[in-house]
């Protein structure tokens, strides 16, 4: 497993249906972009706190993390406390 550098994305096993829905949407978007890409560039950008590689992925010249953020299915992240994906109860 790897993590995209610089983003926080919702979890497929998230705490609420909204988070799980957004996670499925993000997963589908990533899959479609990778399968449809003519060129895929991956660069390791370090390791995260659990030891998984952090990577930057560029598909046909477009940064995948930025595309996820622009679609609202990921947030910028640089190690600070994560914001919840679930609405307040």
Question: Where do the language-model regions lie?
Answer:
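Small beta-barrel nucleic-acid-binding modules, primarily SNase/OB-fold domains
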Residues: 1-89
């Amino acid at each position: 497993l790897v993590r995209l550098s610089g983003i926080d994305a919702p979890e497929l096993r998230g705490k609420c249906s909204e988070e799980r829905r957004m996670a499925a949407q993000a997963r589908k978007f990533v899959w479609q972009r990778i399968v449809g890409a003519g060129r895929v560039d991956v660069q390791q950008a370090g390791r995260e706190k659990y030891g998984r590689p952090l990577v930057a992925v560029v598909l046909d010249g477009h940064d995948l993390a930025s595309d996820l953020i622009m679609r609202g299915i990921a947030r910028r992240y640089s190690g600070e406390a994560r914001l919840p994906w679930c609405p307040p109860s």
